[in-house]
Amino acid sequence: MINIRPDEISNIIRQQIESYDQEVQIDNVGTVLQVGDGIARVYGLEQVMAGELLEFEDKTVGIALNLENDNVGVVLMGPGLDILEGGSVRSTGKIAQIPVGDGFLGRVVDSLARPIDGKGDIDATESRLVESMAPGIITRKSVCEPVQTGITAIDSMIPIGRGQRELIIGDRQTGKTSVAIDTIINQKSEDVICVYVAIGQKASSVASIVTTLEEKGALGYTIVVASNADDPATLQYIAPYTGAALAEYFMYKGKATLIIYDDLSKQASAYRQMSLLLRRPPGREAYPGDVFYLHSRLLERAAKLSDALGGGSMTALPIIETQAGDVSAYIPTNVISITDGQIFLSGDLFNAGIRPAINVGISVSRVGSAAQTKAMKQVAGKLKLELAQFAELEAFSQFASDLDAATQAELARGQRLREMLKQPQNSPIPVEEQVALI
């Protein structure tokens, strides 16, 4: 019979207790109550943050948008076809973030910064939050350097400065995207990093823009963020913030950046769709109450940073599509009030063969004149007034039978000015040539 000594047993138990080292992992897990239309209702996620990433059983990722008493409203960032009612959902403890780095230049990525151009993986150096705070007042500097668009009508009468937000607004098929693409092409010699965000566009349109940029040698300093029309509403909603995060990476490194959101009307529609499905109370035009904040928190991220922070800048050119020229609709008025001016493209001018079809009368740049070059300011000072007077004279001259010599001379000069401001697509003009032309 084996002799069992009690002190040995107690020593063995003590050693095992002392050497016991197991990490306790607490998982915050919930249950799917309901799923459909890109939305899931989840019960049991008690310690979830607003905007936190959640992972479903089929590896689909969602964002927690609605935090209610008894459930969480989640928007899905994928088709979610394999998510079942009663399935489990795990909180990740992370807020949406994307990889960033110099390797993104010349690439086409989706709303989560994953490459979609078939050129292989991208080497990222760090990661940034998709939604980050805009720079404060102290960290900013006044707009003082120009952004040359290469379009004579804009550079002379509606100048844009680095760090400005200038809205491009107009009906469909009036050349809004062309103005933005020309501006990107013109940055070839300016050492400006460009980010083009396509929201809810056809894949063929995005492919054609990428081809144009490649042909003009502009893709090397450009990042294209594409969220196609067939992508879930969540990805269309998040795409502009992803683009802003990529541009911010370069801005905080002291570089000048230019970002184009094409277009924010589609982002607002995607957000409206998500909000209505989440049963948020609808407001004007069925948009939710915080649709102004949707765009203001995005556009406030554009800034000219102070010298202490490296003097980098992010210039934003948001695009808004109007219906039948109605700039007083809800989303257009919201974005007009957030931005530092707008370039209004008119369908009537476009159809009359005046391209770019910029209506100079109601287009304005509130801060850009401080950044305009002295030479341009000198030659283009009275250009806007002369064109306005010409438009008025032209309207009256249709009713007059005989005109005096001074009026005829003014009309002839106005017609010459109008012809001079016409410009073919994808052919920006250097600022020196513009000054000589005027």
Curated annotation (Swiss-Prot):
Main localization category: plastid
E.C. designation(s): 7.1.2.2
Keyword Zinc-finger included in the entry's annotation: no
Marked site (Required for activity) residue numbers: S363
Catalytic activity: ATP + H2O + 4 H(+)(in) = ADP + phosphate + 5 H(+)(out)
Source organism superkingdom: Eukaryota
Keyword Iron attributed: no
Matches recorded under PANTHER family: ATP SYNTHASE SUBUNIT ALPHA, MITOCHONDRIAL
Family listed: Belongs to the ATPase alpha/beta chains family.
Protein's UniProt name: ATP synthase subunit alpha, chloroplastic
Organism expressing this protein natively: Ochrosphaera neapolitana
Taxonomic lineage of the native organism: Eukaryota, Haptista, Haptophyta, Prymnesiophyceae, Coccolithales
